[in-house]
Amino acid sequence: MTYLCTKLSVILLATNLAFSSYAAQVSVFITDKQGKPLTNIVALLHNDDKSNAVAGEQAIAIMDQINREFVPHTLVVQQGTKVKFPNSDNVQHHVYSFSPAKTFELKLYSELEVEPQLFNTPGVVELGCNVHDWMLGYIYVADTPYFAQSNNEGKAIITVPDGNYTLSIWHPRLSDSDTARRSNLSIGKDDIAVSFSLFLPLLPSLVEYDAVEGFTEYD
C-alpha cells in the first residue's frame, strides 16, 4: 500500500509540474523601415525569471566551407556548444578568429577532420580565412537557449515556457541603435506575435563596399 501511495504521489507531482509551465510560440516579425521583411536576423529571448542554461556537452553545430565561402554565413549557437569546421572544398582553408569571445586557428584540408571547437563565451565571433581573404563569417554565441533566425518572410519563431522575457535582435549589419533595443514580453500559454521594425537601414555588405566607385583592392 505504501509503495502504491508513493508511486501515485510521484505521478501527481510530475503531472502538476507539467502543467505549471506552458510552452508558447513567440513569432517575431522583423522588417526594415519600409516594411520589407529581413532574412537571417537573430532574435533572442532572455528569461528574466530564471538563469539561462549552458548547452549540454553533446551540442554540436557545423560551420562549413563551400565554394570558398562560410556556410552558413551566420551561425547562432548556445553558449557551451561545440562547432565542427568541415572543409567541403577541394582546396586548403586556414580559418581563424581574433574575437574576444573565441580566438583560434584551424588549418583545414579536404576530407580531413579536426576536433570541434568549444564556444563557451557569449558574444560575436568573426571568422576569416588566411588563404582566401574575402571569406567572412560569423558565429553568434548566445547566453540563452531561446533564439531563432528570421526566414524569407522576416519571421523568427521561438518556443518558450511561460514567464517574463527580454527580446533583442542581432545581425552583423545592424546598427548599434538597433542591436541595443530591448522589448519586455510577458508570455503565458497563448502564442503571441511581435513586430520589430529597424530604426536604421542595414549597414552595407562587403560586396556593396567593394562596389563603391573608384575602389579596388589595390587602392
Positions of the model-derived regions?
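A short, Gly/Thr-enriched small/hydrophobic beta-strand-prone motif that recurs across taxa
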Residues: 22-33, 202-209
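A short, amphipathic beta-strand motif
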Residues: 26-32, 43, 85, 154-156
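Short, ordered, surface-exposed loop/turn motifs in non-cytosolic proteins
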Residues: 34-59, 90, 133-137, 162-164, ...
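A short, solvent-exposed beta-strand micro-motif common in secreted/extracellular proteins
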Residues: 43, 82-87, 164-174
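Short amphipathic beta-strand segments in non-cytosolic proteins
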Residues: 43-62, 98-103, 134, 141-147, ...
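Short, acidic Ser/Thr/Gly-rich low-complexity loop/linker segments typical of extracellular
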Residues: 58-69, 76, 108, 146-153
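Structured interaction patches on ligand/partner-binding surfaces of diverse proteins
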Residues: 105-106, 110, 141-150, 173-194
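Short, surface-exposed beta-strand/beta-hairpin micro-motifs centered on an aromatic residue
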Residues: 114-116, 153-159
